[in-house]
Amino acid sequence: MPSSSSAAVLVFLLLVSLLTPTFASDSDHKYQAEEQVTLWVNKVGPYNNPQETYNYYSLPFCRPSGNNVHKWGGLGEVLGGNELIDSEIAIKFMKNVERSVICPLELDEAKVKHFKDAIESSYWFEFFMDDLPLWGFVGELHPDKNSENGKHVLYTHKNIVVKYNKDQIIHVNLTQDNPRPLEAGKKMDLTYSVQWIPTNVTFARRFDVYLDYPFFEHQIHWFSIFNSFMMVIFLTGLVSMILMRTLRNDYAKYAREDDDLESLERDVSEESGWKLVHGDVFRPASSLVLLSAVVGTGAQLALLVLLVILMAIVGTLYVGRGAIVTTFIVCYALTSFVSGYVSGGMYSRSGGKHWIKCMVLTASLFPFLCFGIGFLLNTIAIFYGSLAAIPFGTMVVVFVIWGFISFPLALLGTVVGRNWSGAPNNPCRVKTIPRPIPEKKWYLTPSVVSLMGGLLPFGSIFIEMYFVFTSFWNYKVYYVYGFMLLVFVILVIVTVCVTIVGTYFLLNAENYHWQWTSFFSAASTAVYVYLYSIYYYYVKTKMSGFFQTSFYFGYTMMFCLGLGILCGAVGYLGSNLFVRRIYRNIKCD
């Protein structure tokens, strides 16, 4: 007992340590007059390559004296490629600062080359003051008739305007001037100034200035929601027609008691379609362990996405650096019980015997896929010396969360699912000899049904994908989680409806291999999203270089894997309910 109690305490402390930096930061700090306000320098990098970021002092700016003070902002902040360092610039609350020298900068050939390379790559930097971001460019290229490439100039003065309401900082803005040409052997002073301006804006509304209302609340966004909603109405109507009309007629003919031999023979000769495969439709799927694992994982991801969206709506997670990532990781660990429960129940109902394999695969499939992609990307980031490289300590924390929270919960869920919901309950008995599957037209084959099944679900989220991609890859803050919730619900409904229709046509073609077909029919949505990401990369961005290209397609691959597993599980579970419903009332031998 003591050991289990100690483990519970350790887990609790771990979760507290992860969540506290995100939700209890300096953002609610109240300052006294002339109290020191810290300006944190964060990162620099090419503007067109959002993930290619480096330590601010990787450029030859003059560094603070002594040991650099770092700010730990939580797991999500580190995974987001942030490293906040105290600039040690003297800024005091409500005290204006005229032009003052930060430090003298002596230029040599190496420093000039470094700055010129950064300017040619449109390097930008990011600072933070009281958890509010400031951005600026390192320098710029001025046209020069004596030079083909133009004249490289470095901004040497930073003017910081701070708006405050009583004892709280509301808004910060950075402007730069005094551009100086970069020439080896010269010396220039890096200077700054601070201006404090009172404002009536409340602390609760201070982040509004960073939200792009015209972009996210454009009429095309509303139109896409309406269009997807109409698609839901159409598809639910189609499924209802199948259930209420076609199947009702089939039931009436199949269940009719008729003593007339001639009529009975005629009915038998006319009988075809889904009714003929009732003795095979509940035959266990091939690779049952894998199917159970992906369906369980997909059910967990569906619940996870719903929880994170709701928490983002209630808690405005977009305000905190890395808050979404931290919330996602912690919620993933805590919802791992769901994946085990769904997987274990499904595997038991299908008569599975390899329980250890099922438990381990369910608990580790998606995390290890992400770890594999992340390891490759991390290797690239380490080679480039980028802040995107995950520190070893952070890797240990993530592994501890998985090993001591997620993995045990998934195992527990599998055991509970096996014992509580694992009793076989098939409406029809499975025949000993499998029925041969007749040849059908090409468009009724499982591969075609699977590939076509993702088109309509992709169409329902197509516009939202543009807003999500633009937020992640083009420096916009995504805050319309109400839209995302609507789109997610629409995606689930459309996926279920499309998969049910595909399953019905497949069974009517006397093909009883519906389990994997229903999964891939829904999962193929992710294929279309990945194809769209390729279009987005070449048409909507100006990314370049091996580093950014690797991260773009690597992150997109992770996202599409999760989306595919989620949609596949939703499609399978919907089809499973449909199949059990239509075979429940027919007379099985």
From Swiss-Prot:
InterPro entries: EMP70 (IPR004240). Coiled coil: none annotated. The C-terminal KXD/E motif functions as a Golgi retention signal, certainly through the binding to the COP1 coatomer. Keywords: Endosome, Golgi apparatus, Membrane, Signal, Transmembrane, Transmembrane helix. It is found in: Endosome membrane; Golgi apparatus membrane. This is Transmembrane 9 superfamily member 1. It comes from Arabidopsis thaliana. Belongs to the nonaspanin (TM9SF) (TC 9.A.2) family. The gene is TMN1. It comes from the Eukaryota. Changing residue 583 to A: Abolishes export from endoplasmic reticulum.
